[in-house]
């Protein structure tokens, strides 16, 4: 990993603006976006960084946005993203549950919903016939660089359980909703062998949707692309990553008989290496064998 900032620059910024201070390098973000240009749609998981100026930069680069809360939908709108049922939509809302205020917001602005529970489909259909939805499917397995980032398998609350796909598709048909696509995000960190398994699972889901008589327009590879946290850590091979998913997309297209969009939903991959947090040391103290350095940034360890 590289550091785009010189010590002198950071000192000057701290002197000019004070601390604590977040500093981002736009060129690094643009470079990361360019690495993923082979995907039809790059959709930024803004939970990684919902700074309005970062969101505006994403929009200027042609990146779409994913929101996981009503607040994130409003931030996307404030950054200039256009709501609506486009293909691809500029804003998609992803969640496993919706409160009434969030439901009203996605209906008002025609924001497609990436549903992680079947109940969401009925709630949406009751107030917004024709609404576009994605189905986030839990394939029954997961992967992550830690248990906290593993979002697949029976111990994860995220996504509709794979065996309930047909029930979800029936809810879409019965509710007069429109299926935009199928989504699968099972965790953070990249293992190419495991990724191949995920791609195969997606193709099988598309086959089942075809059998159920429900068409779709796209598939989403989710996110979780890894970054190097320290010198010597491996970097992701984005060309290989795309190649695996593109092969799966082509298999899925053969099933449905028409072209399918291929989305990717990176978060930290686009921003984590672009920013630094500047703080000022305000105190130091000892506690037995431990030495603490106290800064003005809060608990951001």
Residue ranges and their predicted role:
Residues 27-28, 45-51, 68-71, 96-98, ...:
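Active-site beta-loop-alpha junctions enriched in small/polar residues
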Residues 76, 161-177, 202-216, 248-249:
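Structured alpha-helical segments in the cores of large, soluble enzyme domains
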Residues 112-123, 154-164, 188-201, 236, ...:
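Active-site glycine- and acidic-residue-rich loops that bind
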Residues 131-164:
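Flexible glycine-/small-residue-enriched beta->alpha junction loops
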Residues 18, 84-90, 104-112, 147-160, ...:
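Glycine-rich tight-turn/loop motif centered on a GG-T
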């Amino acid at each position: 990993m590289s550091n785009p900032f010189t010590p002198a620059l950071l000192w000057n910024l701290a002197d000019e603006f004070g601390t604590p201070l977040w500093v981002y390098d736009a060129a690094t973000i643009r470079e990361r976006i360019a690495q993923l240009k082979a995907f039809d749609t790059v959709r930024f998981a803004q939970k990684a960084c919902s700074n309005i100026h970062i969101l505006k930069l994403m929009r200027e680069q042609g990146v779409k946005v994913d929101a996981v809360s009503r607040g994130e939908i409003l931030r996307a709108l404030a950054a200039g993203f256009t709501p609506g049922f486009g293909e691809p939509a500029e804003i998609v809302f992803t969640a496993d549950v919706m409160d009434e205020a969030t439901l009203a917001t996605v209906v008002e602005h025609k924001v497609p919903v990436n549903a992680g529970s079947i109940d969401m489909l009925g709630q949406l259909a009751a107030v917004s016939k024709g609404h576009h939805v994605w189905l986030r499917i839990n394939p029954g397995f997961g992967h992550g660089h830690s248990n906290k980032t593993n979002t697949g398998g029976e111990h994860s609350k995220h996504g509709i359980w794979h065996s309930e796909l047909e029930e979800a598709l029936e809810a879409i048909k019965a509710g007069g909703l429109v299926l935009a696509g199928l989504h699968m995000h099972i965790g953070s960190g990249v293992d190419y062998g495991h990724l191949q398994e995920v791609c195969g699972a997606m193709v099988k889901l598309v086959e089942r949707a075809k059998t159920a008589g429900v068409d779709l327009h796209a598939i989403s590879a989710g996110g979780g692309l890894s970054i190097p946290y320290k010198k010597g850590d491996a970097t992701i091979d984005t060309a290989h990553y795309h190649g695996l998913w593109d092969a799966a997309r082509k298999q899925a297209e053969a099933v449905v008989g028409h072209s399918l969009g291929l989305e990717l939903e990176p978060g930290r991959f686009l921003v984590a290496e672009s920013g630094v947090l500047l703080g000022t040391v305000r105190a130091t103290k000892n506690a037995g064998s431990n030495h603490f350095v106290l800064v003005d940034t809060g608990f951001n360890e």
